[in-house]
């Protein structure tokens, strides 16, 4: 009995025409608030009255209730949940070039991906580049080189958490009659839109670079030497700011 190695080499196409490909993909993300059973301003005020939140034996309790009652009669019914939202989308563009000839194989690709979140001013943009080169001599040597680069830039929405808007009262307006934002609303609740205009931000970016070189040397039939090496480089930066007014 004997052990051996059988090497099967696929016959390569000697020459191949240049190929160019382009792909565009996109999707739309529309917030759906139908699952929220949200009281309107009139029903919310009545619910609070039945719950005994207003002491009508005091002038303060009586005036506070009537103030909200008058606002509702004038049409006040703020849709707080829609305030920080927008329609988001994802757009992905990719282009590639490939070909082969005279023992050389090459591929180059570029990708740009833009993501706009459903929270206002939220985004994440990605750029990717890749290159592959390979040189092959039949039954002798194969050398290949691969390089990849990726860059990501992102920013979180300054509008805070969506849950902060869900608990707001619809009889409260976010702005006064002069268009100025109101910092504190009924029951000493903070206006979440105030934080969004303070200039707070949380953003960052990252970069990564990878180079890989590999080879295979067929010394004699059934015996070969191969090896590879990789160089990695990456960095990430984050930046945040919270205004003293927050």
Give names to the regions the model predicted.
Residues 1-23, 90-92, 105, 113-116:
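A beta-strand signature from Gram-negative outer-membrane beta-barrel systems
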Residues 10, 22, 95-101, 129-135, ...:
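Residues on the lipid-exposed face of transmembrane beta-strands in outer-membrane beta-barrel proteins
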Residues 14-76, 117-122, 128, 132-210, ...:
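Surface-exposed loop/interface segments of Gram-negative outer-membrane beta-barrel transport/assembly proteins
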Residues 70-98, 243-246:
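Outer-membrane beta-barrel transmembrane domain signature of Gram-negative proteins
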């Amino acid at each position: 009995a004997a052990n051996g190695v059988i090497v099967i080499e696929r016959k390569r196409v000697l020459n191949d025409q240049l190929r160019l490909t382009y792909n565009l993909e996109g999707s739309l993300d529309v917030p759906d608030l139908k699952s929220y059973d949200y009281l309107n301003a009139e029903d919310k005020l009545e619910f609070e009255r039945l719950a005994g939140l207003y002491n009508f034996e005091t002038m303060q309790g009586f005036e506070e209730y009537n103030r909200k009652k008058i606002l509702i009669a004038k049409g006040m019914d703020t849709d707080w949940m829609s305030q920080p939202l927008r329609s988001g989308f994802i757009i992905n563009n990719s282009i590639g070039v490939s070909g082969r000839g005279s023992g050389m194989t090459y591929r180059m690709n570029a990708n740009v991906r833009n993501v706009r979140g459903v929270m206002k001013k939220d985004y994440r943009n990605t750029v990717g580049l890749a290159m592959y080169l390979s040189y092959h001599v039949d039954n002798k040597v194969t050398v290949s080189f691969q390089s990849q680069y990726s860059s990501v830039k992102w920013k979180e929405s300054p509008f805070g958490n969506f849950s902060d808007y869900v608990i707001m009262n619809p009889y409260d307006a976010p702005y006064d009659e002069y268009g100025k934002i109101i910092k504190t609303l009924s029951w000493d609740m903070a206006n979440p839109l105030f934080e969004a205009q303070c200039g707070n931000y949380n953003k960052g970016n990252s970069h990564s670079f990878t180079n890989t070189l590999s080879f295979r040397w067929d010394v004699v039939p059934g015996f070969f030497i191969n090896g590879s090496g990789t160089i990695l480089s990456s960095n990430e930066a984050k930046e945040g700011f919270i205004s003293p007014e927050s």
